[in-house]
């Protein structure tokens, strides 16, 4: 059990027949009446976001989520198959469960799979990935590191803004949290 006073972004709770993650919270103490905690919660299973108010100090069951490192082995139809390299147990997730991070998912990549009991909830990709540029405008003599940026498409199909000097075939490091270019590899 966790007190509503201890809510922080990223805390997972069992509420309303599901697992919810706290996205935002605000502890409010009105001049008259008792304090309360206004939260924005995201359903881990389906991605729904709701706003909910809890009384200050209200006890809520904390979700017991297990995180395990698994490798993305292949894609079958609309499902992505992950395998635990120690137990050889498979987990299947849809693109909707993975979310917009699916654009950086590559076969052979290791990722953290989060489970609630036996049910697979979501995947956390590494903070950065190294991918090859497959399409971008050619570099022109005089392009510098301090110049502007141009769009580039990497091997997984994701589009990233890169410096002007990057060419097709180069391997670049990308931050998966904000889709930004970090450097050459």
Curated annotation (Swiss-Prot):
Q: Which InterPro entries match?
A: Elong-fact-P_C (IPR015365), NA-bd_OB-fold (IPR012340), Rib_uL2_dom2 (IPR014722), Transl_elong_fac_P/YeiP (IPR020599), Transl_elong_KOW-like (IPR013185), Transl_elong_P/YeiP_cen (IPR001059), Transl_elong_P/YeiP_CS (IPR013852), Transl_elongation_fac_P (IPR011768)
Q: Which UniProt keywords are present, listed alphabetically?
A: Cytoplasm, Elongation factor, Protein biosynthesis
Q: Which GO terms describe its biological process?
A: peptide biosynthetic process
Which cellular component appears as one GO term in the record?
A: cytoplasm
**Pfam families, sorted:** EFP (PF01132), EFP_N (PF08207), Elong-fact-P_C (PF09285)
User: Major location, coarse class?
Assistant: cytoplasm
List the subcellular locations: Cytoplasm
* Source domain of life: Bacteria
Protein biosynthesis as a keyword of this entry, yes or no, is yes
One MF term from GO for this chain? Answer: translation elongation factor activity
- Pathway listed: Protein biosynthesis; polypeptide chain elongation
The record's SMART domains line, in alphabetical order, gives: EFP (SM01185), Elong-fact-P_C (SM00841)
Matching CDD domains: S1_EF-P_repeat_1, S1_EF-P_repeat_2
Q: What does this protein do?
A: Involved in peptide bond synthesis. Stimulates efficient translation and peptide-bond synthesis on native or reconstituted 70S ribosomes in vitro. Probably functions indirectly by altering the affinity of the ribosome for aminoacyl-tRNA, thus increasing their reactivity as acceptors for peptidyl transferase.
Task: Report the sequence similarity comment from the record.
Answer: Belongs to the elongation factor P family.
Q: What is this protein called?
A: Elongation factor P
In its UniProt entry, the species of origin is given as: Cyanothece sp. (strain PCC 7425 / ATCC 29141)
Gene name of the encoded protein:
efp
């Amino acid at each position: 059990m966790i007190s509503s006073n201890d809510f922080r972004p990223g805390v997972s709770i069992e509420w309303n027949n599901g697992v919810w993650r706290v996205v935002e919270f605000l502890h409010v103490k009105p001049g008259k009446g008792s304090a309360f905690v206004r939260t924005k919660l995201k359903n881990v299973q389906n991605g729904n976001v709701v706003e909910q108010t809890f009384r200050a100090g209200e006890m809520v069951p904390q979700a017991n989520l297990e995180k395990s490192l698994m490798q993305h082995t292949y894609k079958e139809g609309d499902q992505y198959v992950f395998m635990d390299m120690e137990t050889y147990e498979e987990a299947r997730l849809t693109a909707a469960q993975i979310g917009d991070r699916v654009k950086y998912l590559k076969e052979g990549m290791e990722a953290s799979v989060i489970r609630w009991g036996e049910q697979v909830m979501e995947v956390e990709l590494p903070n950065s990935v190294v991918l090859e540029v497959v399409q971008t405008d050619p570099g022109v003599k005089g392009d510098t590191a301090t110049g502007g940026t141009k769009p580039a498409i990497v091997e997984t199909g994701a589009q990233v803004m890169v410096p002007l000097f990057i060419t097709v075939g180069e391997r670049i490091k990308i931050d998966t949290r904000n889709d930004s270019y970090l450097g050459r590899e």
